[in-house]
């Protein structure tokens, strides 16, 4: 779902706050925030992180700086398994006009090489 669609759905449902939690990525967060601000909706950055135990945990952060730190952590610990768009689809991030800004080179559904305790400790430290 694109940022414009996410925000349109949130607005249609009367939501005042949403969280952006893509699989092992925070790259779409800033654009969702930009679109939300125009619509008067608050947004929390985050990610759905798949740990080495295959636990899917939600991590939330409060600032752009923390989002960037979380993104670097995810990039460092995500296995470099190339994405095959024919099987898993394209992993794109877009701007507020839905123009493609980039494509994640690695499969974002993979588990990172960190356990749930390590993920929790990192998120609490930032």
Task: Name each model feature, range by range.
Residues 1-53:
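An N-terminally biased module of ancient metal coordination in phosphate/nucleic-acid-related enzymes
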Residues 31-126:
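Extended substrate/RNA-proximal surfaces in nucleic-acid metabolism proteins
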